[in-house]
Amino acid sequence: MKIFWSWTVFFIIIFLSQIAISHFITEPWGARTLSETLDKGYDVLYFGDSTVDASADTDTDKAPITEMLRRLKPELSIADLSRSSNHLGLYEAMVGQIAKSGKKPVIIIPINMRSFSPWYDKRPEFQFEKEIFYLTAPSPLIACFYKPLAVFRAINVNAVTFSEFYQTPVYRGKKQIGIVADFNDTVLATTTPENIKTSFMLGYMFDLDAKHRKLDSLRNIIDQADRSGIKIYFYITPINHEQGEKFYGKEFKEQMEKNTDTVCAILKEKKHSCLNLAFSVDPSYFQSPVLPSEHLNEKGRMFVAEEVAKML
């Protein structure tokens, strides 16, 4: 009995220590940045991933899309809430937090088609478990318990393990062609024509299921915003589709049209417009005219800023 109470006291001390320490730990990016932004009362919150701010070495103007939009719409205060690898799963938690705040900024959400691919969707470092926990916690007090809850495995801090990620099926259309482990990151980083071709296939040529978890997040984002009277504008980011078609012919564009149609169908079902920019520009608008990337150069970012400005 004495041993039992000793262990009980020990675990209580550890638990309380973790709580005390957690008060001195800075909130993760999503929760901290969103909280600070809401306090400042911006008119527009611009979500997004690296497609918002990536630039080309040759750009004379390296401003992100958000800054270009500010120049086009000087009457609006626009906050940049973009960060590399952000996605609809995180945006769902962010919109939920905004709805709880009672504030009603306009929100702009870019939809990156590659974020639905097994290659990105299940990548462990893109799950943002800690940020989503902070954003969806019932109260700030509960959020303070993240550290002890994680230590004692009361919450799942590894939504997808690397082992699970490597076993994720990879598809070309509806046909499985392997698993993630069959495609080596380091090898694909070398830009040979064959590796570029493979990267286009991994990033875009899967068949997007309407039941995909990120599309569930899209539906939830719209429902939360509609209930709270928050206006959201969506757009699908430009894709270097001409380069993809060089490798795969009409199969590439047909699959991409099918996938973007799946996204747009959900938006239209929810009475939202779908600004589909996927096929709107040629390779000269991209950071690299040959690589499978949504990263735009100066001309490309200005094009997107102008299209978004028309919605506001």
Q: Model segments located where?
A:
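Well-ordered, non-membrane alpha-helical segments in soluble/globular domains
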Residues: 62-65, 92, 211-219, 252-263
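Short hydrophobic beta-strand that contains or immediately precedes a catalytic carboxylate
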Residues: 45-48
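Substrate-gating cap/lid alpha-helix
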Residues: 242-275
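N-terminal secretory targeting modules
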Residues: 1-43, 102
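Active-site segments of SGNH/GDSL-like serine hydrolases
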Residues: 222-251
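Membrane-embedded segments
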Residues: 51-140
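Histidine-centered active-site loop/cap adjacent to the catalytic His
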Residues: 289-312
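Secreted/periplasmic serine-hydrolase-like ester/acetyl group-modifying domain
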Residues: 124-228
